[in-house]
């Protein structure tokens, strides 16, 4: 799924929760997509050649930042995926929407 579409969907859900204004929701959605894409790139590097210590720290920092943005936006993290063939981050959206083969229990994926 294209990043713009993911951003639009996430932004709409963040606004529907009611904790953020539409502008803040759009900023949160853009940041989440950017961070998740960076995390996915590190997953690709890990699969191909392994991560250096610096890259491991970066990965941990990205996961921490993603959790912080999700908390501020009122969204719930389902899980992080280390497999570069799928989405890097899976969320539990309020209405149970999903976009992966894992179904509702896997959640809505971003970061590809």
Please tell me what each predicted stretch does:
Residues 9-12, 16-19, 43, 52:
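Residue-level signal for well-ordered alpha-helical segments
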């Amino acid at each position: 799924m294209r990043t713009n579409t993911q951003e639009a969907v996430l932004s709409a859900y963040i606004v529907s929760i009611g904790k953020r204004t539409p502008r803040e929701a759009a900023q949160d959605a853009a940041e989440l997509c950017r961070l998740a894409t960076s995390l996915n790139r590190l997953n690709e590097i890990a699969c191909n050649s392994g991560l250096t210590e610096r890259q491991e720290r970066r990965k941990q920092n990205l996961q921490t930042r993603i959790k912080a943005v999700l908390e501020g936006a009122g969204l719930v993290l389902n899980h992080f995926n280390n497999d570069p063939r799928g989405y890097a981050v899976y969320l539990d959206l309020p209405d149970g929407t999903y976009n992966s083969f894992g179904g509702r229990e896997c959640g809505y994926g971003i970061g590809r």
